[in-house]
Amino acid sequence: MKSFYEWYRKHITGAIFVGLILGILTGLFLAGRFNVVLTATSVLGSIYMSALNMMIFPLVFCSIVMGIASIGSAKTTGKITGAAMLFFLCTTAIASFVGLIIPRLICLGKGVSFKMATSDIQATKMDSILDTIKGLIPSNPVSAFAEGNMLQVLVFALIMGFTLIAIGEKGERLLKVIDSCNEACLKIISTVMYFTPIGVFCTIVPVVEANGTKTIVSLATQLIILYVAFCGFAFIVYGGAVSILGKTSPVKFFKAIMPAALNAFGTCSSSATIPLSKSCVEDKLGVPNQISSITIPLGATVNMDAVSILMSFMIMFFANACGVHVSISMMIIILLANVLLSVGTPGIPGGAIASFAALATMAGLPAGVMGVYISINTLCDMGATCVNVIGDMAGCVVLKEKIEIEK
């Protein structure tokens, strides 16, 4: 049994792909003919989605608080941390804007018309900027969690994080409790993720049965456009930053960081690529150890540029496909939330799932989009992690030029 568990854990990505393919085939050829298949997969899919949604709000809250606390505790690193944070947050904002504007300009998802059940969670819909501002502060934090008001949960987490930093040692005990809760939430989510192949199968069957082959075509098109956006962002934004701010040839930069980028693509983990990323920038680009030792690990935690592109892209794609209108004010909320959520997104495979669920809830998308997102998450995650790691190393090159290190 133990050997099977180890084998399954190592090959879970392949199992997810198998579940996706079987789900598509079942939805196309069996679900419409045998009603029991459609009923069974719908029920099991709902159970899987409920298990995931169960921990989304506490995980987002705890992750944001701990992310802010970890940044605050890094004050001893001085100007390097501050400069790195500024670089990462600016590029994340640009990435989120790119992810929102491209699908809107090309109307990605229009005409697909996904048929899905509406979400059980009441989304936070803001009709104007004034309504958004008035709804920022929760009068009752417990109600914000209970009613599924993700925007208020994010703001409450932000306030709590900075408050715990401000009170110093008195807040350490509560931080330890929140850290333990964060680890517990991650453990529960990771346990649920072991059932992802079955969950993907059960959630994709009703979608394919209702929408037919256009589901496959639309998702394939979306993936191609997404990867074009990834490549464009990496070469234009990071290449431009390295050239203009870092005074380094983009060709030299991309050639030097290729081993770390390919490793990130294969492992889907920014954290696991830290040693190789440090080696690339130090040995091939002359980045001082003092800069890389701070910037690379910090980037693995807070630099989620490609994830911001991915999540914004997916939100707009599913909104168009499901007929959900995303107003300008909601786009602004998503952009700001993307920047905030990047602080708490763990640099591990599938770390963006909770963040996507939070944004999907805010945008008022049907609960069923989560199943479709998870089914293609690994394909998206490979490219996203690769771009994130490139961004970490680009930050190192920029900081090498902008910050003087005493020898």
Regions found by a protein language model. Give the residues of each.
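Transmembrane helix boundary and interhelical junction motifs in multipass membrane proteins
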Residues: 56-60, 199, 269-277, 291, ...
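Membrane-interface alpha-helices at helix entry/exit sites of multi-pass transporters
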Residues: 76-83, 187-194, 284-299, 328-330, ...
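Signature of multi-pass transmembrane helix bundles
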Residues: 4-7, 13-17, 22-32, 49-52, ...
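Membrane-water interface of transmembrane alpha-helices in multipass transporters/channels
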Residues: 36-40, 78, 213-221, 249-258, ...
